[in-house]
Amino acid sequence: MLFKCLELLAVAVIAYLIGSIPTGYIIVKAKTGQDIRTVGSGSTGATNVKRVLGKNYFFLVMLLDALKGALPVILAKLFATVGLSLGLAPVIAAIAVIIGHSKSVFLQFKGGKSVASGVGTILALNWIVGLIIALVWGVITYTTKYVSVGSIIALLISPFVMYFLHSPIAYVAYCA
């Protein structure tokens, strides 16, 4: 029992630290010397990076943040042994990486909105669901020109898609 608790704690800590890597902050600081938290919306995420550096860097930060979201979940799926049938360890990793992205220990607990990291976690939990969610997000965002609208709609449908594709119950609960 102690080993299982320690394993889940290790999953959470590692995922949180990976999630805390402030991708947008690092890129904007390297390119302009600015602290992205002092411009635009104050968020360190891809949308605010787009305001400062343009569309190419928006896509770069989206990709890096999605990879940052996926990595801890993939590691948990490969190496964690606790609650395999329920999908518990990968979901703990997903939650921790989202918390890390939005409340980075490296930025005095400030961060991004966790949209790209969230998509990365869903892609890693179930890549088919992740692709459907990413497609919905892209179409809605392109159509409305609002990242937030695309994000909300995509995330609202994610638990239903996860459920209908027979994913572990913890994955469905995570998306809900």
Language-model segments: which ranges?
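Helix-coil boundary and interhelical linker segments in multi-pass alpha-helical membrane proteins
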Residues: 1-11, 73-92, 123-129, 163-174
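Alpha-helical transmembrane segments in multi-pass membrane proteins
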Residues: 7, 11, 15, 20, ...
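C-terminal ends of transmembrane helices
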Residues: 24-27, 100-110, 137-144
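Cytosolic, membrane-interface loops and tails of multi-pass inner-membrane proteins
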Residues: 25-58, 111
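Short, non-helical or kinked segments that cap or interrupt transmembrane helices
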Residues: 34-45, 106-119, 146-154
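Generic transmembrane alpha-helix signature in multi-pass membrane proteins
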Residues: 47-50, 58-61, 71-77, 104-108, ...
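Interfacial segments of multi-pass membrane proteins
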Residues: 50-53, 76-80, 96, 114-144, ...
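Loop-to-transmembrane alpha-helix initiation sites
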Residues: 131, 147-155, 166-176
